[in-house]
């Protein structure tokens, strides 16, 4: 019986779809997370299904406001950071590279000599990924939400740091003197950071990281990123260390699954 239960695929999706349990006249919620998830994801799908277009068209249109939201909260956090800390913000910008039109990552911010590059993806894992039923589905979304954004950021940085672009000197100054780079891929919902998946992720991006100063990279949900923005405002000097330490703790072994809310608690920070 025990071995049978261990091998069983557990699908917790119904708890996200219907986070309340009703007993008589009382309604109970077992998790604040499932309520917040339903408010955000539920609203998204209500809007999605109210539009009689194909999913690709909707996602293309939804992507821009999602990116803009990430840019806005990052800019606001950088401006509101404690005055004694220098937090600089750089929004997305167009440029020409070897005669081709390009666009930078969605936004960047700097804390001292540490550059944090942010790439927003208006996507979330599908049901097959959330339930762990299909390894093929999981691998596809590891690529879309984790691997591809990291490679995209690295490609843009290589172009920005080359001599073959027409980027104004004033914009280029933002990237001068960077000693460490952190990459954040922000999606509607993240692929859960389980050690085994992270090791596969690392193997796929390893060759692209050679001769770079990238110290860590994460795929995080928009909710996680809002917490990151709060850290930018209140303790920006600690944020690079928090992100790099969290990166290492997630990779202790293949069973590691260190989510941000738990890690911040152990670090003495609130998930707000």
Residue positions per predicted region:
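Extended hydrophobic secondary-structure segments that form protein cores and membrane-embedded regions
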Residues: 89-92, 180-188
């Amino acid at each position: 019986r025990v071995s049978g239960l261990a091998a069983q695929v557990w699908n917790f999706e119904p708890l996200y779809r219907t986070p309340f349990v009703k007993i008589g006249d009382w309604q109970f919620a077992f998790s604040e997370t499932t309520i917040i998830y339903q408010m955000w994801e539920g609203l998204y799908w209500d809007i999605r299904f109210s539009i009689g277009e194909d999913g690709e068209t909707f996602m293309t249109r939804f992507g821009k406001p999602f990116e803009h939201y990430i840019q806005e909260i990052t800019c606001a956090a950088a401006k509101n950071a404690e005055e004694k800390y220098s937090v600089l913000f750089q929004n997305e910008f167009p440029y020409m590279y070897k005669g081709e039109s390009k666009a930078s990552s969605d936004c960047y911010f700097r804390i001292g000599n540490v550059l944090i590059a942010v790439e927003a993806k208006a996507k979330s894992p599908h049901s097959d990924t959330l339930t762990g039923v299909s390894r093929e589905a999981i691998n596809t979304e590891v690529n879309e939400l984790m691997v591809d954004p990291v490679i995209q950021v690295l490609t843009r940085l290589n172009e920005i740091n080359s001599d073959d672009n027409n980027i104004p000197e004033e914009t280029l100054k933002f990237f001068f003197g960077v000693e460490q780079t952190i990459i954040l891929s922000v999606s509607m919902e993240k692929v859960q950071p389980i050690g085994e998946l992270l090791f596969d992720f690392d193997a796929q991006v390893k060759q692209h990281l050679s001769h770079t100063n990238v110290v860590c990279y994460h795929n995080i949900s928009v909710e996680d990123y809002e917490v990151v923005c709060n850290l930018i405002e209140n303790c920006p000097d600690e944020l690079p260390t928090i992100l790099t330490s969290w990166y290492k703790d997630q990779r202790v072994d293949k069973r590691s699954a260190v989510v941000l809310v738990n890690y911040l608690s152990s670090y003495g920070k609130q998930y707000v």
